[in-house]
UniProtKB/Swiss-Prot annotation:
This is Phenylalanine--tRNA ligase alpha subunit. The keyword ATP-binding applies. The lineage of its organism: Bacteria, Pseudomonadati, Thermodesulfobacteriota, Desulfuromonadia, Geobacterales. It comes from Citrifermentans bemidjiense (strain ATCC BAA-1014 / DSM 16622 / JCM 12645 / Bem) (Geobacter bemidjiensis). GO terms for cellular component: cytoplasm. The gene is pheS. Belongs to the class-II aminoacyl-tRNA synthetase family. Phe-tRNA synthetase alpha subunit type 1 subfamily. GO terms for biological process: phenylalanyl-tRNA aminoacylation. It catalyses: tRNA(Phe) + L-phenylalanine + ATP = L-phenylalanyl-tRNA(Phe) + AMP + diphosphate + H(+). It holds the Pfam family tRNA-synt_2d.
Amino acid sequence: MKDKLEALLDQALSELAQASTEEGVQELRVKYLGKKGELTSVMKGLGALTPEERPVIGQVVNTVKSKLEEAFEVRGGEIREVVKSARLSAERIDVTLPGRRRPLGSKHPITLVTEEITSIFGALGFAVAEGPEIELDFYNFEALNLPKDHPARDMQDTFYFGESVLLRTHTSPVQIRTMLKQPPPVRIIAPGTVYRCDSDATHSPMFHQVEGLMVDKGITFGDLKGILTLFISQLFGSDIGVRLRPSFFPFTEPSAEVDIACVICRGKGCRVCKETGWLEILGAGMVDPEVYRHVGYDSELYTGFAFGMGIERIAMLKYGIADMRLLFENDLRFLKQF
């Protein structure tokens, strides 16, 4: 029986060495150590041995059982290590690879243009002034020489909250508030949000403006032209053509529309500029004495100029945007281009 047990041990160890999975090891464990296993069958024959043989063979059985249990544990551990190593190799992360960058946002084209305009005028000595978007009739219209019967006061053009409270239609009220707070000299720009009852491919009920004001002794129309020409060359390039056309604004006299050579055709004429070769970008003029009267400035002593432009229009021209509504739709496919 001793030889049989040793042969059983050798056979079990040989088969165990061939096992390549934990399931295979478990099957061999059941085959040799289970209730109906090979070793159990041998142990059942111990009763047929003589009293002298029984303890000797019993010790051999225990030795074989211990060796098998140890062998099964060792082989199972080896297989688990192999499986673990294979999985780690398959799931390995190369720590030398660059990290995955988070998608970064960018500034909106309106913000970009506003900051550029502010920077250009800041270099020319203009401070930034701000005012409320909900404005009084006096600051928005009356102090700017817009009488009660002026068309801009119509409900179709202005959002009213009451008889004298409204959403500002331009940032010019900031100029009035600034002049009422301080004596000359004044040199400010007023960027901000304004509101008008209008909405199409080139207009929005809410849009952005930058208006400027300079008041001091001896300010002339030549100063206005020089500053605006320099501003335009900084914004669109020194080779861009500039012209001023006579116009009318209630709060400036004389007044002018400022055009630049079409950024698409460079003044040759195209569909965008309606074959004229020019694009209007802002309005300007010398401050009307009537405005000075409302803020308590002496129009005989001080002169000055004002100008205003729509930031959306500047952005559309600068970046070649065909439809203003793109600036308000928050489409990432569009915004990621800036």
